């Protein structure tokens, strides 16, 4: 259809499609109900299929699919993908628990082999499966097509666009209940997700695989849910402003991590790149 689109044009069209799909899915919440967030998470992957099979037709060649980073597992990056989210979220909730705003409550039997196997399988496994739909779109397809901007700008822009893509679901549906002031919470979410995107993108570029980024994204969502489930507070609003994806502490920790990554990339600018074959 448009086989000679520049990478910048491909990135723009991809995001327009992905954003349009998530707005549509969000508006269909009265019909879709609890299926809405699950369908929403796969709209970026659907956008990739539309781009590669209909718009640019890159998907009719092996080289086209190779640019998504699906063919390498890169297991040696998986430890960092798990450890990074655990350290950040553990520190955030540890600080919250230490202030007395909230308290940790560990149910009996939580750390038995059976319970751990269940959490890892149905919890982390499902979270990663859902995150895959987003990561194939934003880190698999979009990020490589932004690399002509330079590594730092590409990482930040892919993270920012990913953050913006979340907003229709948050604003048009009750899927993500927000108790705080949106003028405060909205910018925090935007900046936190942008910073998290730097980490996902770093894993994608360093490993040349989308799977470490998928694992990191799934792990972050799962650890947020796990730590929130272990937390009891008399002030949900205070907790919302401090922890979770809407928390100031989460923003600070994530931004510091992103800052370290971007600083480390400065001397090696241009080395973390994905070179797309001509015409892809």
Where are the regions a protein language model picked out?
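C-terminal membrane module of polytopic membrane proteins
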Residues: 57, 218-280
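Alpha-helical transmembrane segments
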Residues: 10-24, 43-48, 80-89
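Membrane-helix interface linkers and caps
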Residues: 2, 34-83, 94-112, 257-277
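Residue-level signature of the transmembrane alpha-helical core
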Residues: 19, 42-45, 82, 86, ...
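Short, Lys/Arg-rich, polar N-terminal cytosolic tail immediately upstream
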Residues: 1-7
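Membrane-interface helix/loop boundary segments of multi-pass membrane proteins
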Residues: 133-164, 205-209
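Aromatic-anchored segments of alpha-helical transmembrane domains
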Residues: 19-27, 86-94, 160-169, 218-230
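Functionally important transmembrane alpha-helices
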Residues: 156, 180-242
């Amino acid at each position: 259809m448009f086989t000679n689109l520049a990478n910048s044009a491909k990135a723009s069209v991809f995001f327009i499609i992905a954003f349009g799909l998530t707005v549509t899915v969000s508006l269909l919440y009265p019909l879709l109900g609890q299926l809405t967030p699950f369908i929403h998470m796969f709209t970026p992957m659907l956008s990739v299929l539309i781009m590669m099979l209909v718009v640019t037709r890159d998907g009719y060649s092996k080289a086209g699919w190779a640019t998504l980073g699906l063919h390498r597992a890169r297991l040696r990056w998986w430890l960092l993908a798990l450890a990074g989210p655990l350290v950040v979220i553990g520190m955030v909730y540890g600080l919250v628990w230490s202030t007395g705003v909230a308290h940790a409550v560990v149910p009996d039997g939580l750390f038995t082999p059976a319970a751990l196997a269940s959490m890892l399988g149905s919890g982390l496994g499902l979270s990663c499966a859902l995150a895959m739909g987003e990561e194939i779109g934003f880190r698999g397809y979009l990020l490589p097509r932004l690399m002509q901007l330079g590594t730092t700008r590409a990482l930040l822009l892919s993270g920012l666009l990913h953050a913006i893509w979340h907003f229709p679901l948050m604003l048009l549906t009750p899927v993500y209940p927000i108790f705080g002031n949106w003028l405060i919470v909205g910018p925090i979410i935007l900046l936190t997700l942008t910073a998290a995107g730097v980490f996902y993108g770093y894993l994608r570029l360093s490993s040349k695989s989308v799977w470490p980024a998928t694992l990191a994204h799934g792990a972050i969502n799962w650890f947020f849910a796990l730590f929130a489930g272990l937390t009891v507070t008399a002030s949900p609003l205070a907790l919302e402003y401090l922890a979770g994806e809407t928390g100031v502490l989460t923003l600070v920790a994530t931004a510091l991590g992103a800052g370290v990554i971007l600083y480390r990339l400065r001397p090696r600018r241009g080395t973390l790149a994905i070179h797309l074959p001509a015409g892809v």
